[in-house]
């Protein structure tokens, strides 16, 4: 195996194995079924390479019903038998060709090793798309497979019967577009996955599909503006991370007006959860947002002089250890962004303002807020000397009044009634205010660019129905999870509720259509975890907001409040390690530990009302619009300023929008961290399959009557239970299926017959498999006799056919011997 997970990831993956299968390798007589195979995590190769997770083995004769005696067969090269307890054995999908199955849920066994093996076989043969209905799983191949060309778009767009084509992002796009116009209801395609899994690429390909109109008569100006905006959004919202060289650091929801025959008529973009802290600092192997590097490398001499652009290594907000990103040409992308600005119809003055603000944000980082003695404070904030010169340049680039901003960063103003009280900020407070200004200017500039785009692409009368596209991170579980992961995981819990509701609705509809009782369908809701995370009272977010606004609030007090308010729930737990600062949330995907240190600081957008007023009064029209419409109260934080309340309000609006649509799900998965083709790490795959609810989708299908097959497929699969029923031409398929089930003596509560298919509970399907296995096993002696009999008859027939040739050969040999006067007795055998 070419790459490995970290020890922490391997530990997580190992914990996700869950219980083993109900394996039946031995018949009632104590004999092992011939050729019976299992998966196990105790195989020699797994001990040598834990990332492998499972290996395939064949069960040997001599096995009892307790432990299984096995020999590993895949990977090969291990011939020594070893013992496997039943608790470490999983069933194998024998005689199954993964390339003929588009849906994982149709496999006989959907345990974890079977799912991993199924996906691996398809991945290694370049089939990166698979269905786990209602999800489409897309595995990043880290290379161009040539399966997203215009020819492929046309194939999926123009086919009459879409069901005959393999899973693909174009399949999802076509189905969503058909539904949009057939039922006149808005659709949403939700694309999720961890950084580097291919979300951005999948979203781009879906956009290309929608843009590919059958006719060329439509106005392409708006479509071109939407497509051209992608480089700008990526430049301002994407960055190089350890996991991905082009990682989206924000969530994006797009609304598109797509024609019945394709082509994008209008659109709108909503961005949320931009990672503002990246503007200030980056980890050792990471970069800030692409736009900073594009500007510094791509600007000509005149532009550098005009906007005071320095070499990248001279900026304190830029990590000097990582100035380049593999596969990214910053200079070429700078020119692409400039071209995109023109396509978005930005004026020359607006473009100049954008570059000025970007440069000003970087230069503001070079301003050091120093400590001085003043007003009885030993470490009063000050900006003076050379720092003042740099500060004035930065404020000039940001189109802000330098003297007024300097005063707000150093002089503390509070109010007692109508009386103004002036003092000094401490050095650390002044530095925090400066950092908040830099983050806020960048964040609001990003939002302004999106607003400009929307003004040019929105439909004049609003959307009647729309095609939605949500590009969002999946559940994030790191070694150290902070407020960013907390917000991301709240978002995913909301999406998970939507997902479960969809699965339940689809299952219920199938049962109704088939005339089958759905009383067996009982799904588990995540409503409780959402409540303890986001409720107005007695929730984690409520406690965080209260502590942020309370005098003397702290991370420790926030955590203490949570413990007191939520002690009656099982979804919030103190951590075993450092419980004074860590806490656990029982999310849908399992327990996730959060570190509360820094929660309050990150939740406070401490850009004070007085500073926002200065920004709003800027003479530059772009800057003046950045904080337009924000309600302010001097001496206090602006209303709605806390990140948590902004996030929750935005999320609730987003969920209302999505819940009004019919959703489709694409789960993007990264098979390795090396970003190399054909490199497959099972432990990494397992973590993502769990975090993206792929395994849960399969589990949900196991509820109620989890097995459902058309009558003919059912008869073919279980025909040996009763050949007189399955092979009877006088019975229609439904009658034959019922007779076979009666012959099996399967309890009636284990199955129902619908209009076109058989429905079996999971236990019933396993019982039928066992019954058929025992039938075949009991026939084995007879089969052996018949095989020997027919082999003998076949040999005799072949011999009889050859007899004339043998007699003729003998005659020729005898004649040869006589002609040469050779006695037969002198001829020596040749063996």
Curated annotation (Swiss-Prot):
GO CC terms, sorted: cytoplasm; myosin complex; plasma membrane
Keyword Hydrolase carried by entry: no
Disulfide bonds: none
Keywords from the named record: Actin-binding, ATP-binding, Cell membrane, Membrane, Motor protein, Myosin, Nucleotide-binding
Region annotated Actin-binding, chain positions: 663-673
PROSITE patterns (UniProt xref): MYOSIN_MOTOR
Protein name (Swiss-Prot/TrEMBL): Myosin-A
InterPro entries: Kinesin_motor_dom_sf (IPR036961), Myosin_head_motor_dom-like (IPR001609), MYSc_Myo14 (IPR036044), P-loop_NTPase (IPR027417)
Mode of membrane association: Peripheral membrane protein
Coiled-coil spans in chain: none
Keyword Iron annotated: no
Family classification: Belongs to the TRAFAC class myosin-kinesin ATPase superfamily. Myosin family.
